[in-house]
């Protein structure tokens, strides 16, 4: 059954300044909980964050959150977590790209900020739970444990970016939007009925701490400027140059400066990134097919699996599901084999395992196994 409370709780509502978190806070207050709103200041220089429609952590967003709290009728505070965010999210993002991996900063923010730094402070101040506008569901199992499940509306489900949470964190998590089969237009209509000015505010997208959306430029600035290197084909032949291998991700097609079309006339995609050699290897789309992967740093939403099992896996925040078999090795590595090959799997991404709608756990992809290709031509 869905997690319910027999008594009003002291709830700290994380309010980003967007419509989802505002409606979530309003629903929590309407349910009878003692709600306090908080906006997280995540940068010593808010101008470095995206502003307007595409932001989530700017001065403008803080003002929107405060206005929403005033309408709801709850106390509101701004908490400075800029240094923690810099260390745990921004620096991690830079280090992962420098190593040739593809991080997910939103997932890391949930793990290290919203349900660690924020939750720890909330519990220390006597709050019972942290409420957010995520679309996911916490379920109270028959044995009394908490389980994380997909949202009722799969189209809006955000359980992937919450797959790093453990049972202790889930016991203090509240997701008021996850249970309802409401469209985003209906959420906006509800916000408008409640008098919330953010009702028509567009959703945030992209990476909040890169103000202009230029990930390559951001990384070049942090890592000492562009360093020209070679773009190679699978045989090692030079096809072109790049301005820094650290800005690419597996499966990328755009931004490849290749001097001439491939012999087969087909587009080329990033297959491999070598920070040591500062090279990027490209190839045809079928070369991206992955049959298995090994993932590290597993985190479980409950008891770890005791042996091999069959699950569905999700590899990206908005990706589809894949049938897999998975086995935990020595408690530290997760070996995952796909029933059918999948494309564009990048080290650094999270693989999240599901048993039906229930999140089993997640781990960080370390290595992949590509499908063998049969040579053709004559």
From Swiss-Prot:
Record site feature (Interaction with tRNA), residues: 134, 349
Active-site residues, Swiss-Prot/TrEMBL: 109, 208
List of residues binding ATP: 14-21, 40, 133
Keyword Protease: no
Interaction with tRNA, as annotated region: 156-158
Pfam families in the record: tRNA_Me_trans, tRNA_Me_trans_C, tRNA_Me_trans_M
Entry's Gene Ontology molecular function annotations: ATP binding; tRNA binding; tRNA-uridine 2-sulfurtransferase activity
Subcellular location: Cytoplasm
Swiss-Prot/TrEMBL GO biological process terms: tRNA wobble position uridine thiolation
InterPro entries, A to Z: MnmA-like, MnmA-like_C, MnmA-like_central, MnmA-like_central_sf, Rossmann-like_a/b/a_fold
Keywords linked to the UniProt accession: ATP-binding, Cytoplasm, Disulfide bond, Nucleotide-binding, RNA-binding, Transferase, tRNA processing, tRNA-binding
EC identifiers of the protein: 2.8.1.13
Disulfide partners: 109-208
Catalysed reaction equations from the record: S-sulfanyl-L-cysteinyl-[protein] + uridine(34) in tRNA + AH2 + ATP = 2-thiouridine(34) in tRNA + L-cysteinyl-[protein] + A + AMP + diphosphate + H(+)
Annotated NCBIfam families: PRK00143.1 (NF001138), trmU (TIGR00420)
Entry's family note: Belongs to the MnmA/TRMU family.
Protein name in the entry: tRNA-specific 2-thiouridylase MnmA
Species the sequence originates in: Streptomyces griseus subsp. griseus (strain JCM 4626 / CBS 651.72 / NBRC 13350 / KCC S-0626 / ISP 5235)
UniProt lineage: Bacteria, Bacillati, Actinomycetota, Actinomycetes, Kitasatosporales
Primary gene name: mnmA
């Amino acid at each position: 059954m869905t997690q319910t409370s027999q008594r009003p709780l002291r709830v700290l509502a994380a309010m980003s300044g967007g419509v989802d978190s505002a409606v979530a806070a309003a629903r929590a207050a309407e349910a009878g909980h003692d709600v306090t709103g908080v906006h997280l200041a995540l940068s010593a220089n808010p101008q470095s964050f995206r502003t307007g429609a595409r932001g989530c952590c700017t001065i403008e967003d803080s003002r929107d959150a405060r206005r929403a709290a005033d309408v709801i009728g709850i106390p509101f505070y701004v908490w400075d977590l800029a240094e923690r965010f810099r260390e745990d999210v921004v620096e991690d993002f830079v280090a992962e790209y420098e190593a040739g991996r593809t991080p997910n900063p939103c997932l890391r923010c949930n793990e290290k900020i919203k349900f660690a730094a924020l939750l720890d402070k909330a519990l220390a101040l006597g709050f019972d739970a942290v409420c957010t506008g995520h679309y996911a569901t916490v379920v109270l199992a028959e044995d009394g444990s908490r389980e994380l499940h997909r949202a009722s509306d799969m189209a809006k489900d955000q359980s992937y970016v919450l797959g790093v949470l453990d049972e202790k964190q889930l016991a203090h998590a509240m997701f008021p939007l996850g249970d309802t089969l409401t469209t985003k237009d209906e959420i906006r209509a509800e916000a408008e009925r409640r008098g919330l000015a953010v009702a028509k505010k567009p959703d945030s997208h992209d990476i909040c701490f890169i103000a202009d959306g230029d990930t390559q430029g951001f990384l070049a600035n942090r890592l000492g400027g562009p360093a020209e290197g070679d773009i190679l084909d699978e045989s090692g032949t030079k096809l072109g140059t790049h301005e820094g291998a650290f800005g690419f991700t597996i499966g990328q097609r755009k931004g490849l400066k290749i001097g001439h079309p491939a012999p087969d006339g087909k587009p080329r995609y990033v297959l491999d990134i070598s920070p040591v050699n500062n090279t990027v290897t490209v190839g045809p789309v079928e070369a991206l097919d992955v049959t298995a992967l090994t993932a590290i740093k597993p985190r479980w939403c409950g008891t770890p699996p005791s042996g091999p099992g069959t699950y569905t896996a999700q590899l990206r925040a908005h990706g589809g599901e894949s049938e897999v078999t998975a086995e935990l090795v020595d408690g530290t590595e997760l070996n995952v084999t796909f029933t059918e090959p999948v494309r564009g799997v990048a080290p650094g991404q999270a693989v999240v395992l599901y048993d039906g709608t229930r999140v089993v756990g997640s781990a960080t992809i370390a290595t992949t196994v590509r499908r063998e290709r049969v040579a053709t031509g004559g």
